[in-house]
From Swiss-Prot:
The gene is Taar5. This is Trace amine-associated receptor 5. Residues 176-189 are annotated as: Extracellular Loop 2 (ECL2). Olfactory receptor specific for trimethylamine, a trace amine enriched in the urine of male rats, playing a role in social behavior. Also activated by N-methylpiperidine. Trimethylamine is present at high concentration in the urine of male after puberty and acts as an attractant. Trimethylamine-binding causes a conformation change that triggers signaling via G(s)-class of G alpha proteins (GNAL or GNAS). Also required to provide olfactory input into limbic brain areas to regulate emotional behaviors likely via modulation of the serotonin system. Gene3D superfamilies: Rhodopsin 7-helix transmembrane proteins (1.20.1070.10). Residues 1-38, 92-109, 176-204, 275-284 are extracellular.
Amino acid sequence: MRAVLLPGSGEQPAAFCYQVNGSCPRTVHPLAIRVLIYLACAVGMLITVLGNLFVVFAVSYFKVLHTPTNFLLLSLALADMLLGLLVLPLSTVRSVESCWFFGDFLCRLHTYLDTLFCLTSIFHLCFISIDRHCAICDPLLYPSKFTVRIALRYIAAGWGIPAAYTAFFLYTDVVERALSQWLEEMPCVGSCQLLFNKFWGWLNFPAFFIPCLIMISLYLKIFVVATRQAQQIRTLSQSLSGAVKRERKAAKTLGIAVGIYLVCWLPFTVDTLVDSLLNFVTPPLVFDIFIWFAYFNSACNPIIYVFSYRWFRKALKLLLSREILSPRTQTADLFHD
């Protein structure tokens, strides 16, 4: 396929994705810009995959981390890691080349995995908010109310519901037959936008905001209770005081993770709703920026843990040293020096 850049122009639709009628126009970027974007995306994918892989390994390996909250963190990290491993490479090519070159089967599979991992993330953050709410607001009953078995049920729901939900829309024709007037065919050959239509724009909005409202309301209550506990903490014994402080620290850290998630995903979610009302007028470049800003969230959580959790930093130090080969390392106490 020939692509020609006009002299003095940075980029322009100078070619088509395929040499067929109805092909999508292809925006050709200068080689230097393409290489720069590929390198930036590669670094982002590396941080996403390795950072979340370490979370998965640390929680799995160190027995002291086998708690309900950490199992939820492990499952969340697994979703983010798989996003970086299976979704982002093809998304990078699509964004840089402005075309989908991988066929209809991979288009549908890529869309399925993309939606699955993103919905799984928000479900897990919602469940983690419930866990922190129980730990802070009802600390005496928390160990019996939120057990490992309960956490595993939440994890199963966090994966199962998004998997069934996304498969229903992508691999059945029920919605297509019932709401054909709302749905549009693929705008052109070489595009992979199966779920970007008016119906999905309206459906995506509550799927994002209902869990977000739940998380915000829970963390507001956590903040009120934690403030009250801070005034009472001096009267507690030293051991109980330390336990309460650890729970509050975890709630604060995970609250930051939820806040960053909202900031990263809000532009994309609002745009999908508004764009469906305005007949999809968002420029492709702006839409790609919103998508990648949302993807960026998957790399954030391990970075948050590094700066917030002593156990995470200690586990990282052990992983990068020879001590990881010692059988005693698996039972190491990561919470004390």
